[in-house]
């Protein structure tokens, strides 16, 4: 069982059942942070949608590695613990070059642009 209320270090996760993203773009970064090759870890499942990973965690299958605030944990048995040292990964938003957006999508992109310029 992982200690509640504190950040997780690589050694805390070495022998734990892990659920990781199916996307392979961050494997090298994760392995470097974990100080282990991914083949040395106890990976019990991978996911494409973090919501599906949350269902596996809720059933006690393992611990999902994911970005914070993707799953609303309020009122559930799930909780988020940050990594120490911090592990960061870039994220990208892409769209068609001449895409016509609805008002909501235009407002969303405008907010994203403002946030990334700060």
Over which residues does each language-model region extend?
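Short beta-strand-to-loop elements that line the ligand-binding cleft
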Residues: 20, 39-52
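Active-site-adjacent beta-strand anchor residues
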Residues: 20-21, 46, 64, 94
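Generic structural signal for secondary-structure transition and capping sites
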Residues: 1, 18, 61-62, 117
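Extended ligand-binding regions for polar small-molecule ligands
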Residues: 94-118
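Beta-alpha-beta core module
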Residues: 6, 12, 51-100
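Secondary-structure junction motif
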Residues: 2, 10, 16-39, 101-105
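Residue-level "edge-of-site" marker
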Residues: 26, 47, 69
């Amino acid at each position: 069982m992982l200690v509640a209320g504190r950040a997780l270090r690589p050694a805390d996760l070495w022998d734990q059942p892990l659920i990781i993203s199916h996307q392979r773009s961050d494997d090298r970064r994760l392995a470097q942070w974990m100080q282990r090759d991914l083949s040395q870890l106890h990976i019990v499942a991978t996911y494409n949608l973090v919501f599906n990973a949350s269902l596996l965690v809720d059933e006690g299958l393992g611990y999902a590695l994911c970005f914070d605030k993707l799953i609303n944990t309020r009122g559930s048995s799930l909780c988020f613990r940050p990594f120490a040292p911090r592990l960061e990964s870039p994220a990208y938003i892409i769209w068609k070059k001449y895409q016509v957006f609805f008002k909501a999508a235009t407002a969303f992109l405008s907010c994203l642009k403002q946030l990334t310029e700060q």
